[in-house]
Amino acid sequence: MFRRITLLILAVALTAALAPLVTAEQQSVTAARATADKSWQGGRFDEIDTLAQAFPKDETIAVYHALSIAARGDYARAESILKPFVAANPAGDAALETGLLQLGVGRRTEGRQTLTLVLTADVRNPSARDFLRAARASRALHRIDDAQSYFRDAIALAPTDPRINTEWGELFVEKYANAEAAKSFQEALKADADYGPALLGMARALADENPPQAVMFAQSVLKLNPNDFGAHLLLAELAIYQDKKADAKESIERVLQVNPRHLEALSLRAALAYVEGRTDEYKKSVAEALKIHPTYGEIHRIVGMITAHYYRFDEAVEHTRMAIALDRENFRAIADLGKQLMRIGDERNARRNLETAFRIDKWDVMTFNLLELLDHLEPFDTINEGEMVIRLAPDESPVMKEYVPQLAREAMAALTKRWEFTPKGPILIEMFPSHDDFAVRTLGLPGMLGALGACFGRVVTIDSPRARDPGTFNWGETLWHELAHVITLQLSGNRLPRWLSEGTSVYEERRARAEWGRDMDIPFARSLERGQVLKIRDLNSGFSSSTTISYAYYQASLLVEHIVETHGQRQLRALVEAYADGSDTEAAIKKALGINIDELQASFDAALDKRYATLRRALKVPEGLAPGLPLEKIKAIADANPESFAAQMTLGEALAESNPDAAIAAFEKAAQLIPNVPGEDSPHAGIAAVALKKGDKARAARALEELTKVTHTDVESARQLAALVDATKEPARARTVLQRVVSVDPFDAESSAALGRLALKAGDTAEAIRAFRVAVASKPLDKATAHADLAEALLQAGQKDEARKQVMEALMIAPTFTRAQDLLLKISGGSR
């Protein structure tokens, strides 16, 4: 009994003596792991080297050490560091990172075996960390359903863990589910606002929709970790998209200075070299990447992706095919090929590749969207118009086929003549009644809220009039704009910078119709007054921000107009063509215009100052003018500032109720100062409103006429004007107004019918037939009359058989319809 008590006392004593030693060691290892994690998150690789020497037997620290060694390009040594830990624990973190390393250098069979062992291990009572490891392994093996399941299990155990939320978010980004990705990253940042991987994830999730904010997030990552390769390369990619190639090169080289064998960095360097025509450097980067990873088709996919951004879609297709030839399991390349083929109009082969990609990866949102879109396109009506193929939604085709082919013919005839260039066809034009379908057709994802059309060189996609609320845009203006892109993109070999491409298209809008392409004149003048106009060298960057893009479009069009007015149309053509041989903007300007970019900047600045001097003076707001002033004070300010638009408008608004005549006089002064103000802020809108209140319909009509000239999308004002104009006394004027209405809203059956009747009276049977066909197709309330109208126009044009068909349609609806009966007798040569 004593001996037993003595042994028990000794055991307790030994335990008491050893406990502090074990706890201290555990605490030391735990602290070292935390330090290693902080060092890794901060990109301080040398600190991790030191920790690894101090704790050579700890798997977690060994993993950080291997990651830091791999980050410096020594992939073989990184794997050798992990090897003993993998042997001891084939299902641990070291095994996971080994498998990822093996996949990363092209040893696919070994990598899959290693990761499969990670997944097949029998783990009792798995922790959140175990589920995360399984999720990452499943993702690498493209077992996305399993990965999603493991992520859910991990989150259930550790809902606020920033690493789990971030890793899950990265999976969503990979599959283009950016909204879901952002939710995961936001959860991570709630737990740790400075968690670099989550900040980088937010940057990636925002890169498509909000590039400036994405840049801010990426830059915040680099403040925490100057060696975050992902942040550097995202900034490089965004810089490429803004045509800031020098910035992109700097970001890429920052990565390659630390890791000269970084495959994605080599890929972006190759892509940049390719689009700049530096063929030897492109080949060198490709060779370096393939030496590391012999089947790294991703480098060709990335080159194709960047090349496509520069609108060189045929070349993008070639590069993406090279990616697949090198790695037939690269499902992203297969999906990309489908997307690129759609951009060159090869929808049959696009579908084949997209279906292949979708069989491999059913979680890819973009692939799913594009396949669904192709299903939507199947019932579209196809109209062959010379070298153009026009596709219209079946429920819109009966109306839009009367307008789209005619305008497309007019545009291509005018543009090919002016530019002395016939583009390669066929030119595919697709019009979408759903804006989201248009966005998916263009980028693969819904959104693109500000875009109305897109051009890929031989493919044009646009919103139909029904894709947005009537009066918010003009589909004809958009179509003309995009067809101008067809000319300039092909003439330049798809190498045009965006400022010149968009600027030329907006300028061509103004050339086509006096009222098109002028919406930004007043906002641009205000921007000029604030000194916020971009320099020519920076003009491309204006297209990457939602706050500056509208200004960039308009400024670019003014620059193109200045080039034509100063140097001539042939020199503008020469400038566009100069890019075909790979010239950059400065070289192209020198080659085509015979001046350097600074000289062009100086002459453009002078032209803007001259053009906007009067407008800028008129836009200045007098001191003391503010809302709520008494009428006498407003009068005094307006009298003292007769050249102030704001003063005259304020006076007109103040007098509108008490003295309509004086209000109209004030609005007229404002209109003389700035005649082209669009919308409800226009003095013409003020005049129309006051004139209608006082019963002066003639004055209201004149004001609305001026308003609709400068606000060509204002269909409601045009309808109001149509109601005021007496068609019996002024048929030509009424006809012009109705033409404006149907140009914006072709589905207005009543306006189309009224236009048809006026055209028929004027002897223009072609316009009458078209207008009546549209009225019939627009499902009017009085269908019988619509058919009879069309029959009458067809009969007048000598098309008796067609006229008879329409009369019979009318009589089927209303058998006792006298007018239709009379028309039938007339067609048959009889009489009552």
Residue ranges with predicted function:
Residues 64, 97, 131-133, 167, ...:
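Canonical tetratricopeptide repeat
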Residues 113, 156, 183, 190, ...:
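Juxtacatalytic substrate-recognition/specificity segment
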